């Protein structure tokens, strides 16, 4: 008798992707974040669906509808905080996933890597639009400031901003369309994640050594399903600790005040996961230059496969590149801190140095280190 999972058209796809998939025998816990991101997406879509049942995308009632969810809906407060903190968790996993890809040279799988960058842009767009929906002070002013950046685009900028706003300022039309896009984008992200997996399974997973592992593969189930399950348990433990004990730890107190176009908050800043890019944006005095730097701060990842000079794929046996990688990680932490600070000395100069260092490490120091390490291999 044939096994159903190997013959049934639908089950066969699941089988090839999650059960009989040949996986390298030595992949570490850093490879858990793909499945954890899948879990985060499921949490966000499920909690978001229930929130959408009670939310009204209208400037007069949006803020009070969120209040109503927290006060009057059964476990509404839990769903709302799961959704808000789920976004933070999503980005923690996302940045760790990207960091692992950079450390172990996973960017050599160019199709998978490029789809990943598109996924990052889509997730950032979704999170930004979601932050606007509660219609608090930071929602309104964040939407105004960030959408206004598009006016820096020559010739079409102003028209583009007014087209996105649906008027001459951020108002009801903006909130309505942001809600529509915020609802549909996670499903597009889910579809793109499938494409991401499709490309990954064409080549097979990378491993910590960065060498071909065809001679030593093991089935995904039960080895990595159990390993992923452990990761999921740990992630959920951290997640519910955050949601139930410190729900407002990562939020902004200003967003508990209803949006008021006549009163500007003293420090307009996005959620913590955008602060590093926001710091890079602010470090350039020119508006168009800042917008270009902001986009490049993410788009620079697409250059990694093209500026790779080292003969070894992984950084595991490359001490100079390892030092530069951790310097880059530290630099991103500094940028995140600077993004949350007011625009005044000494934060301005620290932000400018950190921004310059960010691009210099990726575009210059890393390729040079690769060449030096190639020479060291011959000694």
UniProtKB/Swiss-Prot annotation:
CDD domains: cytochrome_b_C, Cytochrome_b_N. Gene3D superfamilies: Cytochrome Bc1 Complex, Chain C. It is found in: Mitochondrion inner membrane. It is a multi-pass membrane protein. The keyword Transport applies. It holds the Pfam family Cytochrom_B_C. GO terms for molecular function: metal ion binding; ubiquinol-cytochrome-c reductase activity. Signal peptide: none annotated. Belongs to the cytochrome b family. This is Cytochrome b. It comes from Dipodomys insularis. The lineage of its organism: Eukaryota, Metazoa, Chordata, Craniata, Vertebrata.
């Amino acid at each position: 008798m044939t096994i159903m999972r190997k013959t049934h058209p639908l089950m066969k796809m699941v089988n090839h992707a999650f059960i009989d998939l040949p996986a390298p025998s030595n992949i570490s816990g850093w490879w858990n974040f793909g499945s954890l991101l899948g879990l985060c997406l499921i949490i966000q879509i499920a909690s978001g669906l229930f929130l959408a049942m009670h939310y009204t995308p209208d400037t007069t009632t949006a803020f009070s509808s969120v209040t109503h969810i927290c006060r009057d809906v059964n476990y509404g407060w839990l769903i709302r905080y799961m959704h808000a903190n789920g976004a933070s968790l999503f980005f923690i996993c996302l940045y760790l996933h990207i960091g692992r890809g950079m450390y172990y040279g996973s960017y050599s799988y160019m199709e998978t890597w490029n789809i990943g960058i598109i996924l990052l842009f889509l997730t950032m767009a979704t999170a930004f639009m979601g932050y606007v929906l509660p219609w608090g002070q930071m929602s309104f002013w964040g939407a105004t400031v960030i959408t206004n950046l598009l006016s820096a685009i020559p010739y079409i900028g102003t028209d583009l901003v007014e087209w996105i706003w649906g008027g001459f300022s951020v108002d009801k039309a903006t909130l309505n369309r942001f809600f529509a896009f915020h609802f549909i984008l996670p499903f597009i992200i889910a579809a793109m994640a499938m494409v991401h997996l499709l490309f990954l399974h064409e080549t097979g997973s990378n491993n910590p050594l960065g060498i071909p592992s065809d001679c030593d593969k093991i089935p995904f189930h039960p080895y990595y399903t159990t390993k992923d399950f452990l990761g999921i348990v740990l992630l959920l433990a951290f997640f519910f600790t955050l949601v139930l004990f410190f729900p407002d730890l990562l939020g902004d107190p200003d967003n508990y005040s209803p949006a008021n176009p006549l009163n500007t908050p003293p420090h307009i800043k996005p959620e913590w996961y955008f602060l590093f890019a926001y710091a890079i944006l602010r470090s350039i005095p020119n508006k168009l230059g800042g917008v270009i730097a902001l986009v490049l701060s993410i788009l620079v990842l697409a250059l990694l496969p093209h500026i790779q000079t080292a003969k070894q794929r992984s950084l595991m046996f490359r001490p100079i590149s390892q030092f530069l990688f951790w310097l880059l990680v530290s630099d991103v932490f500094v940028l995140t801190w600077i993004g949350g600070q007011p625009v005044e000395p000494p934060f301005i100069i620290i932000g400018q140095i950190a921004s310059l260092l960010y691009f210099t490490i990726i575009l210059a120091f890393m390729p040079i280190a690769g060449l030096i390490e190639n020479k060291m291999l011959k000694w």
